[in-house]
């Protein structure tokens, strides 16, 4: 949505905009161009079901949310998209506190995991599954690594601002999360898988 004319054609006016539960309707003439996450090089995708890891390729998909998560401010600006008559439309914007987010439990865990090394190391299963690619032979390499080796493969994780995409409806009660971290400029990414166990959320797999 980098072009104003295109963006205007893909907003369902009057647009529902909620701020901490209070709703207003924004008319077409009052709409201001929104860059969304166009200026962000890194974004993430969250999956809460192992069967949905290819959801971005699902042509039957009709619902997507994009969350602009400000961890320091403790806020979320959520853009809601729905497919209507074959076209993706922005149908709502919902600004709310991070503490009231649908996936607040996992997000609170992720914030600590991404910023606290000791906490991070205590939430990695030992051993953990690992998958990578040999770009010389184009072969997949899979195995297991000792938790002590995590430091050699730990990806850079968004901390202050996280732009997160979710395909389909959220399943906050699911005990599975996969978090894909994607760099637009590098054209590369990695995926971390977590499962909720007796100790809380634990990293169980890394695909790099």
Spans of model-derived segments:
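Helix N-terminus capping/helix-initiation residues
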Residues: 2-3, 27, 116, 146
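Surface-exposed beta-loop interaction hotspot
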Residues: 84-122, 129-141
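Short loop/beta submotifs within extracellular cysteine-rich repeat domains
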Residues: 4-7, 88-89, 121-122, 201-203
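Short beta-strand edge/turn micro-motifs at domain boundaries
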Residues: 72-100, 187-208
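Surface-exposed, charged secondary-structure patches
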Residues: 17-74, 134, 138-188
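Generic surface-pattern signal
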Residues: 2, 11, 38, 115-118
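Acidic/polar, low-complexity intrinsically disordered N-terminal segments immediately downstream
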Residues: 1-24
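Surface-exposed patches in mature extracellular/periplasmic domains of secreted proteins
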Residues: 7-12, 120-128
């Amino acid at each position: 949505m980098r072009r104003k004319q295109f963006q205007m054609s893909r907003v369902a006016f009057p647009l529902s905009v909620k701020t901490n539960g209070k709703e207003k309707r924004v008319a077409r003439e009052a709409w201001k161009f929104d860059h969304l996450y166009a200026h962000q090089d890194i974004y993430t995708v969250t999956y809460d079901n192992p069967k949905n890891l290819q959801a971005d390729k699902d042509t039957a998909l009709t619902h997507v949310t994009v969350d602009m998560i400000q961890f320091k401010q403790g806020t979320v600006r959520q853009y809601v998209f729905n497919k209507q008559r074959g076209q993706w439309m922005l149908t709502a914007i919902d600004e709310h506190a991070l503490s009231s987010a649908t996936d607040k439990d996992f997000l609170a865990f992720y914030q600590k995991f991404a910023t606290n090394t000791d906490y991070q190391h205590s939430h990695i299963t030992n051993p953990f599954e690992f998958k990578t690619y040999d770009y010389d032979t184009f072969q997949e390499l899979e195995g297991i690594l000792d938790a002590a080796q995590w430091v050699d493969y730990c990806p850079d994780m968004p901390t202050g601002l996280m732009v997160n995409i979710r395909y389909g409806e959220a399943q906050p009660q699911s005990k599975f999360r996969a978090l894909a971290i994607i760099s637009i400029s590098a054209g590369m990414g990695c995926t971390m898988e977590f499962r909720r166990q007796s100790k809380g959320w634990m990293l169980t797999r890394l695909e790099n």
